């Protein structure tokens, strides 16, 4: 049986603010929104989380920026039981993230920065 799975590919942090149904995108307007949810995403995280939930040891193989978001990305992976020892940090670009725009009652959209992927 396989002892450890290595998952490789796209890795990002999803930033999902809680949005009201009546959200308006009026230029210059201040909108009151709810708390921010931060979840590690992309194929590395999503596949890794499922494998770990099935009892497998999982090692992530991806690249993040040598920045605060890269540190957060690695912490979020570690928090769900995925090894981050093979993740490469680079100063040549920034870490990947998506802003998940999901007002109540409306299908979500993603505003994405590819970053180190």
Model regions and ranges:
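Glycine-rich phosphate/adenosyl-contacting loop at the front of the ribokinase-like
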Residues: 1-61, 71-72, 78
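Conserved N-terminal subdomain of the carbohydrate kinase-like
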Residues: 29-31, 38, 53-117
């Amino acid at each position: 049986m396989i002892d450890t799975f290595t998952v490789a590919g796209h890795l990002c942090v999803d930033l999902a603010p809680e949005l009201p149904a009546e959200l308006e995108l009026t230029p210059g307007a201040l909108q009151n929104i709810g708390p921010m949810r931060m979840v590690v995403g992309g194929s590395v995280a999503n596949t890794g989380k499922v494998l770990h939930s099935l009892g497998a040891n999982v090692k992530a193989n991806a690249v993040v920026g040598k920045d605060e978001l890269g540190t957060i990305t690695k912490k979020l992976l570690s928090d769900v039981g995925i090894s981050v020892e093979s993740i490469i940090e680079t100063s040549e670009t920034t870490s990947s993230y998506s802003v998940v725009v999901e007002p109540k009652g409306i299908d979500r959209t993603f505003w994405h920065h590819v970053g180190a992927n």
